[in-house]
Amino acid sequence: MIPVTSFSGKTVAVFGLGGSGLASCHALKAGGAEVIAGDDNADNLAKAAQAGFITADLRTVVWANLAALVLAPGVPLTHPSPHWSVLAARQAGVEVIGDVELFCRERARHAPDAPFIAITGTNGKSTTTALVAHLMREAGYDVQMGGNIGTAILSLEPPRRGRVHVIEMSSYQIDLAPSLDPTVGILLNLSPDHLDRHGTIEHYAQVKERLIAGVQPQGTAVVGVDDHWCAAIADRQEQAGRSVVRVSVKRPLAHGVSVEQDRIVLVSGGARSEIADIGGIGSLRGRHNAQNAACASAGALALGVSRDILQQDLRSFPGLAHRMEQVGRKAHVLFVNDSKGTNADATEKALSSFDEIFWIAGGKPKSGGIASLDAFFPRIRKAYLIGEAAQEFAATLEGKVAYEISGTLEAAVPAAARDAEGAGRAGAVVLLSPACASFDQFRNFEVRGDRFRELVQALPGVTPVV
């Protein structure tokens, strides 16, 4: 745990008592603050009370007595409208911050030179975060990995020399961290997402840019420039005097890092050199993972990791569950769990990675549906549609891709397996990449992916991929 000493002797309200909120309560208390915990959920309030914290309806507190409101990232700050606790804090002149801001203040007070790598982007954050952590760990660092990827940042060990914090950050967390100042900031890509919480793509991009704008003066900003939003951010931040490493998987760069025929190439000062060859690495299959690998490599290089280590340890990266995870094989058929593909942009990355696809898709639909994926329809031999989006997706696929409305994973998995095996096509893949949220049938995308894995591995003749 990281004790938060910057509010010692002061009273702080924490609203939103899930994992990161409760971790904030513990960290603030350990640092000497008095904590008042609030939540709209009675069960969360009860858990906080059982943990020994003062709980209250924050509508009844005297806001003038509070030094700060620490807001959980899941609570609306601006859109669709500010949460009532945010309005109350602002009316009283109380700052509204998040757990990453508390981390940044502690690091600035106690270990400002401790390496801190922050990663964001619409897609690929978790894989890149895990890959950076893997590379740094293999290079001999004491690595603390957390943030949006799972472990709350304040539940990690405190910053110190020789210890690197590798933190995945959502736009919500960035929005609550005005002092964000990573040693290395990585922005992978941007596409419309979470607009219910940001209003417009322009505001969403502005929030993401803050991670790059906050990079320390001697630090490095790594920016994927294959979309126009990020390309513009790279230009602006370079003009502002920051050291920017551009990354592309679509074209060679005159200066920066690119991926050419599975080779990560660095061009700097006119000199061209190969960093690593990622061909044949199953956990880094596909162009999207090439971008993840290139950005992670650029970040590791910025902290002094050698190229020899990069080549060796990119190959030993095991990958992440639910992100192009190979969960089983039966004869010529591969089963791939990409449950994290919760929007069309993410699913595009999966569809672009295979040629003979038996596609399981659907769930709680997102704006835009799957019309943007039509360039990949020729790769799809048949689609198996589940969840609320089934009828909408069927209308999009009509006349272009064979499909059946399976309704559930329990029906879709054996049907897709039967058809893939019967087709006799080399390179056949049963791919779960739903292009949808999971909340219509599952608690989250992890539960959905776990269920897919269970169903696949229960099929006769399937062997796990190791």
Curated annotation (Swiss-Prot):
The keyword ATP-binding applies. Pfam families: Mur_ligase_C, Mur_ligase_M. ATP binds at G121, T122, N123, G124, K125, S126, T127. GO terms for cellular component: cytoplasm. GO terms for biological process: cell division; cell wall organization; peptidoglycan biosynthetic process; regulation of cell shape. Pathway: Cell wall biogenesis; peptidoglycan biosynthesis. It comes from the Bacteria. It is an enzyme of class 6 (ligase). InterPro entries: Folylpolyglutamate_synth_CS (IPR018109), Mur-like_cat_sf (IPR036565), Mur_ligase_C (IPR004101), Mur_ligase_C_dom_sf (IPR036615), Mur_ligase_cen (IPR013221), MurD (IPR005762). Its EC number is 6.3.2.9. Keywords: ATP-binding, Cell cycle, Cell division, Cell shape, Cell wall biogenesis/degradation, Cytoplasm, Ligase, Nucleotide-binding, Peptidoglycan synthesis. It is found in: Cytoplasm. It catalyses: UDP-N-acetyl-alpha-D-muramoyl-L-alanine + D-glutamate + ATP = UDP-N-acetyl-alpha-D-muramoyl-L-alanyl-D-glutamate + ADP + phosphate + H(+). Disulfide bonds: none annotated. GO terms for molecular function: ATP binding; tetrahydrofolylpolyglutamate synthase activity; UDP-N-acetylmuramoylalanine-D-glutamate ligase activity. Belongs to the MurCDEF family. Cell wall formation. Catalyzes the addition of glutamate to the nucleotide precursor UDP-N-acetylmuramoyl-L-alanine (UMA). NCBIfam families: murD (TIGR01087). HAMAP family: MurD (MF_00639). This is UDP-N-acetylmuramoylalanine--D-glutamate ligase. It comes from Nitrobacter winogradskyi (strain ATCC 25391 / DSM 10237 / CIP 104748 / NCIMB 11846 / Nb-255).
